[in-house]
């Protein structure tokens, strides 16, 4: 058995004060995201999305954050996937971004909605050709007989669409509309900085939490 008890890091890079935080948590998220990109953090847009299905059981997976706007956080996926089925019956999610190199994480909770078909079309058209083919070939989360069947299907779709690939109707974007956003900065002695924003009567309330 692997001994994990003594695997730990001491956090000491930066501090996070209320004065440093923007009044708008989405702008604060953009600021931290930009700093992660500038620091060349590995996969700075990778975020864990947790959902809960009708059976009450949670599931989570890492997806790529593709946009932060005034409403929330946007990601794209197959609507028939496990997360898509979860969101169809329980349209809420918890999201986490972790930037180990900066000793930071951001936690988001909120309602999830599909974005407009037009916005999904626009993003889909920007994807590499092979990724667009893959969106048609993959019945995400479905059991398949083997890898060859997937590759054969992709080849058939590529032959059918050698140039332009339309967006599959079952593929598109979601937006997580935050009700809570927490910013975490690792600090010495595990006395971390935690600044939480929560939505109250349409206004953001900012508060410090005990680590």
UniProtKB/Swiss-Prot annotation:
The keyword Flavoprotein applies. Binds 1 FMN per subunit. FMN binds at residues 61-66, 76-77, 83, 105, 140-141, 184, 194. Keywords: Flavoprotein, FMN, Oxidoreductase, Pyridoxine biosynthesis. It holds the Pfam family PNPOx_N. Transmembrane segments: none annotated. One of its GO terms (molecular function) is pyridoxamine phosphate oxidase activity. InterPro entries: Pyridox_Oxase, Pyridox_Oxase_CS, Pyridox_Oxase_N, Pyridoxamine_oxidase_dimer_C, Split_barrel_FMN-bd. Catalyzes the oxidation of either pyridoxine 5'-phosphate (PNP) or pyridoxamine 5'-phosphate (PMP) into pyridoxal 5'-phosphate (PLP). This is Pyridoxine/pyridoxamine 5'-phosphate oxidase. It comes from Mannheimia succiniciproducens (strain KCTC 0769BP / MBEL55E).
